[in-house]
């Protein structure tokens, strides 16, 4: 894929979109543009940064992978795409964009129609999940959630039997709620170096980071509302330098986690 071919794809979209009325055909036109964008920008930058890469922009982390932890609710509607399986230096990882939607009962009004479905959709998570191999294998489960996390995320942890604990770090306890099946196992992970690194990482991502430890895996959710690796409006010419910088920025959480949390 060359930049000229990407621009051809964008121009083809603009030439045909006004003629196409069928929604499915319109979506297919945009899909072709998106595919070209990700082949040129995203795949190139992944190849330049990581090794052992398997990237599929249509696939994601399946809901079962998260729900089988017993700690993460995947809601009523679950979307995931931009699946990356790769290695950064010596660390294997998986990451994908994830959106989780929960249906909740709305309030009845005087105009309530009993035939209509009276529900409200709430996006409870929009961001990314990352899965890493973790060097410290544990036999229990540990969840570290941002203070103020909604009951949607705390309820599964409590139902799984994890108990709240605190560290000796006042600041860490102020920004995170820690739940563990076994306190001894939790403190095996939460040594002073890790606590300091996690505080730094959470600060970098505005305290919207949740960490889950299950055996030799670490799951990290960043609920920042971002949808990474998405193309710009096809109606406008593509600024190549701007888009390349944006893709590099979208990749940054992966390298940040590995570097800041000292997973190497």
Q: Positions of the model-derived regions?
A:
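Charged, low-complexity intrinsically disordered regions
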Residues: 40-264
């Amino acid at each position: 894929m060359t930049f000229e071919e990407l621009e051809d794809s964008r121009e083809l979209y603009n030439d045909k979109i006004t003629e196409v009325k069928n929604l499915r055909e319109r979506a297919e036109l945009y899909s072709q543009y998106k595919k070209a964008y990700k082949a040129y920008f995203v795949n190139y930058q992944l190849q330049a940064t990581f090794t052992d890469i398997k990237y599929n922009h249509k696939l994601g982390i399946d809901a079962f992978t998260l729900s089988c932890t017993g700690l993460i609710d995947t809601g009523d509607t679950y979307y995931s795409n931009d699946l990356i399986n790769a290695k950064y230096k010596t660390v294997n990882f998986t990451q994908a964009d994830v959106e989780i939607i929960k249906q909740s009962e709305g309030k009845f009004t005087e105009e309530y129609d009993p035939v209509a479905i009276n529900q409200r959709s709430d996006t409870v998570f929009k961001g990314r999940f990352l899965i890493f191999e973790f060097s410290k294998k544990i036999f229990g489960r540990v969840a570290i959630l941002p203070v103020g996390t909604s009951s949607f995320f705390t309820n599964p942890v409590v139902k799984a039997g994890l108990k709240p604990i605190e560290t000796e770090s006042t600041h860490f306890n102020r920004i995170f709620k820690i739940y563990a099946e076994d306190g001894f196992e939790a403190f095996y992970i939460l040594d002073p170096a890790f606590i300091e690194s996690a505080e730094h990482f959470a600060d970098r991502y505005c305290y919207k980071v949740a960490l889950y430890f299950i055996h030799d895996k670490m799951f990290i959710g960043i609920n920042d509302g971002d949808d990474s690796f998405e193309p710009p409006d096809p109606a406008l010419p593509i600024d190549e330098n701007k888009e390349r910088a944006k893709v590099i920025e979208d990749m940054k959480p992966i390298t940040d986690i590995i570097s800041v949390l000292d997973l190497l």
